[in-house]
Curated annotation (Swiss-Prot):
EC number: 2.4.1.11
Annotated alpha-D-glucose 6-phosphate binding sites: 280-281, 283, 286, 290, 500, 583, 587
Protein role: Glycogen synthase participates in the glycogen biosynthetic process along with glycogenin and glycogen branching enzyme. Extends the primer composed of a few glucose units formed by glycogenin by adding new glucose units to it. In this context, glycogen synthase transfers the glycosyl residue from UDP-Glc to the non-reducing end of alpha-1,4-glucan.
Protein name listed in UniProt: Glycogen [starch] synthase isoform 1
Any one Gene Ontology molecular-function term assigned to this protein's record: alpha-1,4-glucan glucosyltransferase (UDP-glucose donor) activity
Regulation: Allosteric activation by glucose-6-phosphate, and phosphorylation by a cAMP-dependent kinase.
Protein's organism: Saccharomyces cerevisiae (strain ATCC 204508 / S288c)
Family stated for the protein in its record: Belongs to the glycosyltransferase 3 family.
Keywords, comma-separated and alphabetical: Allosteric enzyme, Glycogen biosynthesis, Glycosyltransferase, Phosphoprotein, Transferase
Amino acids binding UDP-alpha-D-glucose: 193, 199, 320, 509, 511-512
Region Disordered, residue ranges: 687-708
Any further remark recorded for this protein: Present with 6300 molecules/cell in log phase SD medium.
Amino acid sequence: MARDLQNHLLFEVATEVTNRVGGIYSVLKSKAPVTVAQYGDNYTLLGPLNKATYESEVEKLDWEDESIFPEELLPIQKTLMSMREKGVNFVYGNWLIEGAPRVILFELDSVRHFLNEWKADLWSLVGIPSPEHDHETNDAILLGYVVVWFLGEVSKLDSSHAIIGHFHEWLAGVALPLCRKKRIDVVTIFTTHATLLGRYLCAAGDVDFYNNLQYFDVDQEAGKRGIYHRYCIERAAAHTADVFTTVSQITALEAEHLLKRKPDGILPNGLNVVKFQAVHEFQNLHALKKDKINDFVRGHFHGCFDFDLDNTVYFFIAGRYEYKNKGADMFIESLARLNYRLKVSGSKKTVVAFLIMPAKTNSFTVEALKSQAIVKSLENTVNEVTASIGKRIFEHTMRYPHNGLESELPTNLDELLKSSEKVLLKKRVLALRRPYGELPPVVTHNMCDDANDPILNQIRHVRLFNDSSDRVKVIFHPEFLNANNPILGLDYDEFVRGCHLGVFPSYYEPWGYTPAECTVMGVPSITTNVSGFGAYMEDLIETDQAKDYGIYIVDRRFKSPDESVEQLADYMEEFVNKTRRQRINQRNRTERLSDLLDWKRMGLEYVKARQLGLRRAYPEQFKQLVGETISDANMNTLAGGKKFKIARPLSVPGSPKVRSNSTVYMTPGDLGTLQDANNADDYFNLSTNGAIDNDDDDNDTSAYYEDN
């Protein structure tokens, strides 16, 4: 019986399903609404059960209740019953996010007694070794086998639907070679969000990674770092998948050389873009959140607060504490050069640079807490005195011209300000003073290893100590932000909105959600041409015009380290010297780019990847279904095509709009898009069910900006 390609089932597999660890969690969570709108109950996520977090992430459902499953999905219920009878424990329910997709979380401890048997089977089938004490690899093997068990049962019981399994990262990759070896009738897609070797080699910081990709002895490099078995899993997954994809052009280049298979396409990461009805709304949000950051800055720099907040800009870098990979080293060095330039030029501008990277700490410093309390106490006292003065002015004006009052308004300061209030105000003001020679701290927490912390050591090296003469001030906040923070009570998104510029000079960043999030919120950012996001935007926007849209791209691939640092310092200085009006206009342009990052657009790339998988797995059936002639030569190749870039913006750029007959490829680089390369516009009729509108209308967006 032929499987139904149009009404197929989709299972997405990852270790970060309902389990926040890194960026894949954000990808799955933000993509879910679009995927659920497209697939409905035919979409299920599979992953390992994290007992510590699942109860707050998942609404459990009674999977034994037949009403939970539509009739055509009863094979899934029967498979779960069979696995439960054989001792496999799991949680079935709805993920508590927008779209509420169905999830199956397998308890790996319930199958751990199979570990040695499955390891032996993995060696005999695929030849992949697995050391005994690598717990992460052990869990990857358990997850791979239990997923293959599940998919194998479902494919046997359900002969009517085509089944697609989409696997993210090597931790979910064990299942791919097993599906191939065990001949399970499932279309497989593997997406690598970062290669193992790439992350290890770049973290070392002593190699020109991207310009030497073709020269690495991958087996030797993996062996030297003790990850050869993990590398084997990753490489086997890439080679046995029907469709192999990465998240960016730069990662595709990396995967081609390190994993020895050229990716079939690119699946860029998107975001759920919330559009405002009017431009001024997000500008007002910026002003509100900036005021909260101002409150923190007043407290942190009390006693040395000699700069004008209206003439101050806020820069920040945020992410995992990967000192070199995330470009923290380059950021600090560029800040030191910027500080020198501003001092030499006599600039009145001040830069406050935040580093938001979690490190091991004991607690907030007493000084950080005390500083905020001192300023808050002054603010409360001033508010109380102000209220009293207002009341006295009101009483005075009410009594005039009676009681011998000669003026409509009080003219005697003593009449307005009582002596007790003067004393209280003086005490509060004197409390602001710091001991002689004491400077505002550069870190807000007590570090567990202050002496060996790379960020603090570099700050000491470049002598950015928050001296009064410094035009660049530095604050290292070694903890992710949240609204319950006692010194900087903002969630991360609120903090980003309040800042002026995000700086992310990463050296190894397969995609880069942080600059993408900045773009969606209308905050200009600095990225690099070796980050996925930077390469993506560089491909869409004319290189010399990207900064007009608030996207500054530093060259870390073809310039020397010193030249890259100088370029970053140039970009930051250029931004500092902008007027307030110029910054507002730039934020408007930046926010308009957000449509290019919406999952409603990016989700199409996933549709195309599934299409290519179905074409390869069922070529003749697919040809009959869509009624087209596809040559064998075009079946497994992705053609290039003419690409257009966004031109220089006008002072008030128009809204993005799709042009008819456009051949713009949303996937950057040489690989092209899966859909365009296979002339597969018909697939929208087969798969999206109207969830993703592909019509040309005023609400659609593309790589074009038209003047309205």
